[in-house]
Amino acid sequence: MARITILPDILCNQIAAGEVVERPAAVAKELLENSIDAGARRISLSIADGGRKEIRVVDNGSGMHPDDALLALERHATSKIRSIEDLQAIGSLGFRGEALPSIAAVSRFELVTREPDAVAGTFIRVEGGVVREVRETGSPAGTRITVRDLFYNVPARRKFLRAADTETAYICDQFQRLAMAHHAVHFQLINRERTQYDFPGAASPEERAGQVLGAETLKRAIPFCVENASARLRGMVGTPDLQRANSHSLFVFVNGRPVWDRAVNRAILAAFESLIPRGKFPVAVLFLELDPLHVDVNVHPTKREVRFKHPGGVIDTVRGAIRDALCHLRPLHGSAAAAPRPFSETADQRAFRDSLVREGQLSFDRGRPLSRPPGFPSERWRERHRPDAEPPYPLLREPAPTENPRREAGSPPAAPADSLFDEGAAPQPDNPDTDFFAEPKRAAGGPASTHAPVTVDTAAFADAFQAFEAATHLHAGDVPALAELPVIGQLANTYILLEAPDGLILIDQHAAHERIIFDALSFPAGGPARQRLIRPAVIDLPPRDAAMLRRWLPLLEEIGVEIESFGGDSFVVHAVPAPLGECPPEGLVRELLASAIEGDDAPRWNVLGRLAKTAACHRAVRAGQRLRPEEIRLLLEGLDRTRFASTCPHGRPVWYKMTLSDVARLFQRT
């Protein structure tokens, strides 16, 4: 066996470079972070050939003393920390003193730097970790670092680099994330001698997010801000329809540092769980500020990952803040349908009408406006369907008796199930007092939460949300209510067809009803309304299922199932959620129990969502089921009152719109 020996410094630096310098993007990241730590207000990044040929960073920061410039090329030489206490409370992006020597060990490296009050600057040239030249030079205040021929002396690493465009994409991602984290700094990226990004210093993180993500994305983003004794979380999330195919749209920053934390990402996805399809990702920008003592950034070679002292509290805060922000999305229409907007002919409609005139299929003049567009509700239809009008259909039954709190024990039972829909099952109107950050209810004797209560910065949120509403026009009168549109009929007893002013709307009846029931179970303040059973149902379970049910009784209570032990392995059901009032209690409880067991190791809020999904799917009308006109109307009215009418709880689309232009293209009309 060979004797143990100490490796030479050059080899040590090349080994260290394998951890720190994974690819050109890692070089760009380390150099940009050094510029930010130096207090630069303007930073320029230039690359060539995806960073393999050249990476150059120029800043107007504090610069370095000549002695410090040479010392910075030694391993573990840094100005950021002096003691273990400094490491535990680190606030800078860099602190290990590994980046510059590691980069210089695998490239042809040049450093030019000057302090603001120095007469001359310092030039240092390094090749493969060996200092070749040191001299004075003229230069502006700040630092310029040039890295050429990356991995020229490590062929095994160089051959595994991807194509230039791919490496450029990685660099752009790092550049955008650091630019997003430090909005006041002017960032510029030059690729192949052409400016690819130029982000002037912004007044706020939201303004910088608009520069990076684009103005259209910013218009469809919902801001939020929450704060507690130990942390502050602010940011924005895109509306559910703003989906992406990958997770590159998730931007998470902890104390100004871009990080990739699986738990935080899962919390973001959990907040959108019932709003976007599985495999899709939302747009989210999160800025988390907390005591440096509560987060460890020294757990990954590239400082990409962090470890939280209280991960559960962070995850709950992230999910709750996003979910609360999404719940402030108003329904397109309130409990009473909004008055339709006056009709004005759109460009698509004019083009469609003109094509018919040209082909002799329409007799009116081109310049003559339509008195009422095809498919728009007539005055008679509107009057007949006013929210306060008498029901036009004699078969429409009254809502089943519901209670929240419970109905009187002597009340008469609900009417037989003549209709598939119950107006009492509609979601409750927005309640500004709903607090998604309140301490969860716990059973008597259960452990109290150890996390400090979270308070919402209502003033900041209100200002931001008013701006958001003004930009996105989420007001009730902006879109005609679905219930006010003429119903063409059902297609294959599965899809409801509506005639819109500018086209055709197809609605998946099962997905729409699922969304209505899910929101009724999930979002009303105080929990969903309950329907008390005239005759309590007794359920006998196998011992294993009985033990599991005892564990999940508080969760079943939260979604509206009132159930208690009846001795041994028997249970008695006294009430069920009003939207599920016609479901057999035994079958409902067994199905909910199976869903809870399937998510046994999931967080409490995840299991609650799973239970609500199961209940909604169990109760919703099926594809292929014929609906009466009054049932279709009730479904459309419920959809108008729903916050997230565009998707079902599983993230599938509820409706699809074909404009007149889409139809014209199908028939090759121009």
UniProtKB/Swiss-Prot annotation:
This protein is involved in the repair of mismatches in DNA. It is required for dam-dependent methyl-directed DNA mismatch repair. May act as a 'molecular matchmaker', a protein that promotes the formation of a stable complex between two or more DNA-binding proteins in an ATP-dependent manner without itself being part of a final effector complex. Pfam families: DNA_mis_repair, HATPase_c_3, MutL_C. GO terms for molecular function: ATP binding; ATP hydrolysis activity; ATP-dependent DNA damage sensor activity; mismatched DNA binding. InterPro entries: DNA_mismatch_repair_CS (IPR014762), DNA_mismatch_repair_MutL (IPR020667), DNA_mismatch_S5_2-like (IPR013507), HATPase_C_sf (IPR036890), MutL/Mlh/PMS (IPR002099), MutL/Mlh/Pms-like (IPR038973), MutL_C (IPR014790), MutL_C_dimsub (IPR042120). The keyword DNA repair applies. Keywords: DNA damage, DNA repair. This is DNA mismatch repair protein MutL. The keyword DNA damage applies. One of its GO terms (cellular component) is mismatch repair complex. It comes from the Bacteria. The lineage of its organism: Bacteria, Pseudomonadati, Thermodesulfobacteriota, Syntrophobacteria, Syntrophobacterales. PROSITE patterns: DNA_MISMATCH_REPAIR_1. Residues 363-451 are annotated as: Disordered. GO terms for biological process: mismatch repair. Belongs to the DNA mismatch repair MutL/HexB family. Residues 379-389 have a biased composition (Basic and acidic residues).
